[in-house]
Amino acid sequence: MGIQILPPQLANQIAAGEVVERPASVVKELVENSLDAGATRIDIEIDKGGSKLIKIRDNGSGIPKDELALALSRHATSKLHSLDDLEAILSFGFRGEALASISSVSRLTLTSRTAEQTEAWQAYAEGVDMAVKVMPAAHPVGSTIEVVDLFFNTPARRRFLKSDKTEFTHIDEWLKRIALVRGDIHFTLTHNGKTVRNYRPAMNEPQYLQRLTQVAGRQFADEALRVECQHDDLRLSGYLQSPWSTVLTDTHYFYVNGRLVRDRLVNHAVRQAFAQKAEVEQPGYVLMLDIDPHQVDVNVHPAKHEVRFHQSRYVHDYILQALQSALEEAGELGFERPFEPSSPQVRDEVSLSESGAQTQTEHHAFELQSPESKTHSTWDEASRVDTSRAEISRDSSLGERTRDIASTRPYAGVQSNAYGSMAVPRESRSGSTGESRARAELPSKVAIASYGELLQTPSYNVQDKPYQPVLAMPAILNGQYWVLAQEQNLSLLPIQSVALATRSHEIETKLATGLIGQPLLMPVSIAADTDWPALLEEHETLIRQLGLELTIRYQQLIIKKVPPYLRDSQLAKVIPEWLQSLRFEAPAPNALAVWLAEQSLTGFTSAADIWAAYCQLTEEKRQQIADKAVSLPWQSWLEEQAIE
């Protein structure tokens, strides 16, 4: 048999093998088309598990009469026109295969009307013929698609369908998934004439929690932790199962730009985040990741169930850090394991003891939010400020934005963390201990001033009033050397060595009182060696003196603060190397100063900056640096020139 082009009907049926796996696949493709059309209400009608009838009705923009027949053709779509569109796709559909594939294995009727049309039109296609008949019809603005007798012309595929109940369960499960990410849409689902699901629009958080309860169950919704995290072009939001919950759940939903995907990356990040917190092997979650569409490829799976991130490691670490932070916030804000006394008398005693005393919780130093963050955050204690550095001690907090939430939930605690993340412990139906939680006080003026002072720590090369050097800067040779002329001597002074010396001197001076650490907007996580906890404890004073904030959590070293001299360094490489050196001996202050200076030389922007710093040194220090200049044998050169 020679090579030949397949007939369109056969090609569509082959494509249908990938696109149309079962009735739930048809519902998925058609509902996603309705969402792309801007529908706000979608009604789904199913008969006999979808094998007899699948009917989707929406109030979207509709399809013009001239495009009805074209819509049932292969690779016909309105959602992209170039490769650039494909690389930044945000719509659900984009290949133009669904309607053609579905119509090739069923009897399909598409009725639609646009707002510009005075009447609706209906297109009909049946199986192998693929001939589209268009006729007038009555229909409001929007579209209705009826798929009758699925797989009627492919008996082998029809035999592989399960029972009506099983097939409808798959449809119901898919609708749950899309209902969680599209809370603004009103969905209804009918099976054999009976309304099974009615998801009303969720335009605010209480309404969304009602939908979450419908989908994931009341216990998950009541105990779930809210996650809200923004960093550059990444935004993670959603809900996590309580780490102390012992209830098994199959709520494992992850969305990328509104698209439900299965991704081992997020599963690994969730398991790693819960490694030492949760009592369940696979915690439940509903997480939604918004990312620049150019940074993710959605065109790697026939059914679009998988995506590929261009920076998968970065996305993994981002999700991991956000979840770990939310879990830690939940623990620090008093979201504890529910305690249920066995007898009414014990319950009364517990209630009295909780109402008579306020719980106090000790917190470690923490990572503050970036100045750009819009989330209000407050804390209990005022910071202690001295002339050398500002230190802020973290305590539980309640800000203006969180008091509204706290008023409707017993656990009075919503804390913003380093990632802009909020962990919101939700009320448990069986317990009321949260009502007796102590509310944090508003911050004092001193605390607010200290907070601002810490976040606005100036960079090492920024000065309020630029220093005007008294000495004129020498000529520069080859962009690397200063040419020094003194009496009868000419010498070359490497600019790089001057930069290193001036920076080392500056750092060594500040080390005496301690460097001010600057919070990282996105803390860095590194796999920790077994002896690092002991190293951090042994050299705690030195680490504080350097302005570093390092913690060990879940066998990971978390870098939260660094001095300004390390902000532009590769922290994942520099910090481990420094910790390795601590195994042998603690470095002297001058050695530390040189090490920090070497990491921060990119801070100088020009030779003029370096010369200005050089001129501020004492004369003795300047002379020590100048002594390192390389003398030029200019006299011998002149003599050789004269001989020639």
UniProtKB/Swiss-Prot annotation:
Q: Where is the composition biased (Basic and acidic residues)?
A: 373-400
- Gene3D superfamilies of this UniProt entry? 3.30.230.10, Histidine kinase-like ATPase, C-terminal domain, MutL, C-terminal domain, regulatory subdomain
Q: Write the record's keywords in alphabetical order, separated by commas.
A: DNA damage, DNA repair
Q: Which domain of life is it from?
A: Bacteria
Q: Name one GO cellular component term.
A: mismatch repair complex
Q: Name one Pfam family in it.
A: DNA_mis_repair
Q: Name one GO molecular function term.
A: ATP binding
The record's Gene Ontology biological-process terms are: mismatch repair
Using the UniProt annotation, give all residue ranges assigned to the region (Disordered).
336-400
Q: Which HAMAP family match?
A: DNA_mis_repair
Name the PANTHER family on file: DNA MISMATCH REPAIR PROTEIN MLH, PMS, MUTL (PTHR10073), DNA MISMATCH REPAIR PROTEIN MLH1 (PTHR10073:SF12)
The family classification in the record reads:
Belongs to the DNA mismatch repair MutL/HexB family.
Q: What does this protein do?
A: This protein is involved in the repair of mismatches in DNA. It is required for dam-dependent methyl-directed DNA mismatch repair. May act as a 'molecular matchmaker', a protein that promotes the formation of a stable complex between two or more DNA-binding proteins in an ATP-dependent manner without itself being part of a final effector complex.
What protein name does the entry list?
Answer: DNA mismatch repair protein MutL
Organism name = Shewanella sp. (strain MR-7)
The organism that produces this protein has a lineage beginning with:
Bacteria, Pseudomonadati, Pseudomonadota, Gammaproteobacteria, Alteromonadales
